[in-house]
Amino acid sequence: MTTLPETKACKVNIENEWLTISFNQPEKRNALTSELTDDIKNIFDAARDDLGVRGVTMRGEGGIFCAGGDLKMFKTGFQGGEQGMKDVEEASALTGAFFDMINSYPKPVVMLAEGAAMAGGLGMLCAGDIVVVTEDCKFALTETTHGCLLYTSDAADEEDSVDLGGRRII
């Protein structure tokens, strides 16, 4: 069996040939921080060819699946004027590639959600092969309130924001 990598933002467990990844940043509402996405990518890479792992379950700790993107990074990086449109497009493309990695994984990926799956958290949830949610789980696509178009490599410019009726743009 492959040795799984050390993680910063996840708990990892293998039991009965099944890998469980638990997002373990409830104080950040299990946001898609760079630490969390790096952990998930590294775990998926390590388990990809491991015959001792037949499938993967992903879930959130602390009563929430995932609140989406890391808004602290978003506000300082993208809305702080330090990065341009190209940087926003690259970040969006990386997010899309992350979802594609989950969706195209060669083993079944089961998503278990409770609490909320918001923005990129909902995108990640939809990338799974099987999705199970609690009856009271909340869902929302809130990217447009931050000037981003949904799961594309684009961000809204001034002209687009007028078309979308937006008030804030990147």
Regions found by a protein language model. Name each.
Residues M58, D70, M124-C126:
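Hydrophobic/aromatic residues within transmembrane alpha-helices
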Residues M1-E61:
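Conserved CoA-thioester-binding segment of acyl-CoA-metabolizing enzymes
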Residues E35-D39, L94, M101:
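Charged catalytic carboxylate motif
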Residues Y151-D160:
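Conserved small/polar residues in nucleotide/adenosyl-binding loops
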Residues D163-I170:
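Hydrophobic alpha-helical segments, chiefly the membrane-spanning helices
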